């Protein structure tokens, strides 16, 4: 009621999409516990799973779709980005997409590539999914990882006119990106995302042209350039 007064709100959750975690156990947890909260669940899906396994995931009450991720191609304890340059179809293959389309299921897509959504292969493959599997509810996470305005211009603008493509704004803090998305996509196809538990930390983000830096007062591996205690004391929740 504080954030969305007078509106009915439903949350959607899923497990941790990394092979260092128990994928099957996390899926079972979300479809067991989320319906009791009247939340929707997404199942984390391994790219190696056959069509029948995806069918089985979607048969559970409350499971409305899947969460694929390129890190599920193979485990590397040193980096989640070993497969960042993969094709979308390397971690969400066509036989799974066929099942998802038949069920009119939801897919939250964290796009690969260091160049983010604007990479030509991502643009081509998103359009291919939309053409071949039009009944999938395709949601592009983090505005296609568009954390800076140049990335948003390259990634969002070529796809913004597709009325069947949806977006979430989780982890996007740049007001210029939000303004661009509101202007070219509009509020009807943008969903609010928290990216929790990641963004339950306190901190702030700085950006300059195409680069950005996350700062936090917590001892995360990436937090090597700490700001002064006086600045950190003023951090808010991401």
Model region roles, listed by residue range:
Residues 1, 23-32, 86-95, 120-126, ...:
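Well-ordered, non-membrane alpha-helical segments in soluble/globular domains
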Residues 1-15:
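Catalytic domains of carbohydrate-active enzymes, especially glycoside hydrolases
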Residues 3-4, 33-34, 157-161:
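Short, conserved catalytic or adaptor-binding loops enriched in Gly and charged residues
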Residues 10, 18-115, 166:
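Active-site gating/metal-coordination segments in enzymes
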Residues 16-20, 46-49, 71-75, 113-116, ...:
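Short, solvent-exposed loop/turn segments at secondary-structure junctions
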Residues 23-28, 51-58, 78, 116-132, ...:
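Distinct, well-ordered alpha-helical segments
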Residues 60-65, 102-106, 132-137, 158-166, ...:
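Glycine-enriched alpha-helix->loop->beta-strand junction motifs that scaffold or abut catalytic
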Residues 141-238:
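H/E-rich (His + Asp/Glu) clusters that bind or coordinate divalent metals
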């Amino acid at each position: 009621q504080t954030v969305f007064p007078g509106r009915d709100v439903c949350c959607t959750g899923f497990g941790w999409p990394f092979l260092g975690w128990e994928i099957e156990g996390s899926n079972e947890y979300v479809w067991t516990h989320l319906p009791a909260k009247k939340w929707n669940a997404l199942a984390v899906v391994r790219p190696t799973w056959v069509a029948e396994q995806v069918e089985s995931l979607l048969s559970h009450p409350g499971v409305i779709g899947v969460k694929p991720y390129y890190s599920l191609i193979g485990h590397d304890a040193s980096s989640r980005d070993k497969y960042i340059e993969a094709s979308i179809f390397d971690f969400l293959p066509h036989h799974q997409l066929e099942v998802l389309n038949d069920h009119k299921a939801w897919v939250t897509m964290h796009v690969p590539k260091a160049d983010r959504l604007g990479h030509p292969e991502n643009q081509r493959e998103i359009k291919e999914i939309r053409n071949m599997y039009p009944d999938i509810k395709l949601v592009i996470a983090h505005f296609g990882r568009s954390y800076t305005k140049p990335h948003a211009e390259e990634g969002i603008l070529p796809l913004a006119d597709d009325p069947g493509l949806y977006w979430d704004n989780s982890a996007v803090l740049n007001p210029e990106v939000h303004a661009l998305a509101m202007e070219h996509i509009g509020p009807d196809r943008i969903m609010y995302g928290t990216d929790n538990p990641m963004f339950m930390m306190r901190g702030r983000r700085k950006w300059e042209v195409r680069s950005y830096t996350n700062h936090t007062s917590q001892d995360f591996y990436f937090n090597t350039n700490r700001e002064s205690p006086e600045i950190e004391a003023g951090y808010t929740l991401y």
